[in-house]
């Protein structure tokens, strides 16, 4: 209404040509697509634009998406005040992940916004605990970094001792420790850590760091010299995947690397062995082995969370929802919460201590 009042245009917030009319009226510049020269408005462009009316368009889009994607979906799937989503154990025709993490559909409860400080809590506040309980959020602290350290210890890799010592002393932060070891800012250490864990290439990692190629190369060199165990582990797991075509997660689940590609650098479609042999000849290698560490760590994190859910179920404790490394459960009192934490922390045994952070409130939206 404010936009129409000031410009006389009844804007369709998802139609680029309609938004372009507003920009033209306000004498504002905007991008166009290369092929058709059609108006182009990205989310970041609209959100970061200095003009207040443009910010209102971005805000209206955000609210509309939250309503249609989440609120309407929640109402649609509500049954007697509860929602029973479909949970996908592994990758299949109807959803799921290749790493073994749970995914949800109809509705996708894991996508309910958390980072949006305004809309996220409002939508999450629709989720309430059982009567006379509080909503408890139990979150594995640094689940993936702990698993990296666990495997580095098992392989006796150089440089991991300092991290192990910190974890045994108490509330250690992996990214802080690595930043100190590598003598780089924490933000850069965290970006490199997560990039390596997730199998990110050097170019993408450089873009995430937001620095020049030369600066990125210096950072990588310094990181790998001072924190050698991460790259060593990544290389070891990649070699195992390349030689045997498989790796196993913490609790023994098999991750296969059954597709092949030519040895030479370039963009090639990964193919089954016989097809790749016919297409490219004998100079082929297994594809996607650069993702081996990611599959090992995420797959093992999934193992840990699922094992915790099984152990909780044995005690009659049923989570309402699982979101990555977090379980949300109706909690009776402090003693009940401590019991849940203890079960989760001891569901599997690692070479470093496990830690579960706990927060509670009257509903999901009041937490963080």
Name the predicted role of every residue range:
Residues 28-29, 178-318, 358-368:
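Conserved catalytic core of nucleic-acid polymerases
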Residues 213, 332-337:
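Helix N-cap motif at beta-to-alpha junctions
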């Amino acid at each position: 209404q404010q936009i129409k009042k000031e410009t006389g245009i009844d804007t369709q917030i998802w139609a680029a040509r309609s938004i372009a009319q507003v920009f033209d009226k306000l004498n504002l510049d905007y991008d166009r697509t290369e092929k058709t020269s059609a108006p182009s408005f990205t989310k970041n462009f609209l959100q970061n634009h200095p003009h207040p009316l443009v910010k209102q368009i971005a805000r209206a889009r955000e609210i509309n998406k939250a309503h249609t994607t989440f609120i309407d979906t929640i109402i649609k799937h509500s049954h007697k005040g509860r929602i029973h989503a479909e949970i996908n154990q592994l990758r299949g025709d109807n959803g799921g992940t290749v790493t073994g993490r749970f995914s949800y559909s109809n509705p996708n409860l894991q996508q309910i916004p958390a980072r949006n400080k305004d809309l996220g809590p409002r939508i999450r506040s629709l989720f309430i605990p059982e009567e006379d309980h509080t909503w408890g959020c139990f979150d594995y602290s640094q689940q993936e970094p702990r698993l990296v350290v666990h495997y580095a210890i098992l392989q006796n890799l150089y440089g991991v001792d300092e991290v192990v010592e910190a974890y045994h002393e108490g509330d250690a932060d992996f990214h802080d420790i690595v930043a100190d070891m590598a003598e780089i800012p924490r933000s850069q250490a965290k970006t490199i850590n997560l990039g390596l864990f997730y199998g990110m290439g050097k170019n993408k990692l450089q873009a995430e760091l937001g620095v020049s190629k030369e600066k990125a190369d210096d950072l990588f060199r310094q990181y790998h010299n001072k924190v050698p165990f991460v790259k060593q582990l990544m290389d070891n797991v990649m070699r195992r995947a390349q030689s045997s075509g498989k790796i196993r997660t913490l609790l023994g689940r098999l991750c296969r690397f059954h597709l092949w590609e030519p040895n030479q650098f370039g963009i090639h479609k990964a193919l089954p062995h016989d097809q790749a042999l016919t297409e490219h000849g004998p100079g082929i290698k297994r594809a996607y082995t650069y993702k081996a560490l990611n599959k090992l760590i995420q797959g093992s994190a999934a193992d840990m969370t699922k094992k915790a859910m099984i152990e909780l179920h044995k005690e009659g404790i049923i989570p309402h929802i699982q979101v990555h490394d977090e379980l949300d459960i109706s909690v009776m009192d402090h003693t009940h919460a401590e019991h849940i934490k203890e079960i989760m922390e001891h569901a599997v045994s690692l070479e470093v201590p496990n830690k579960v952070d706990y927060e509670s409130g009257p509903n999901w939206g009041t937490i963080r």
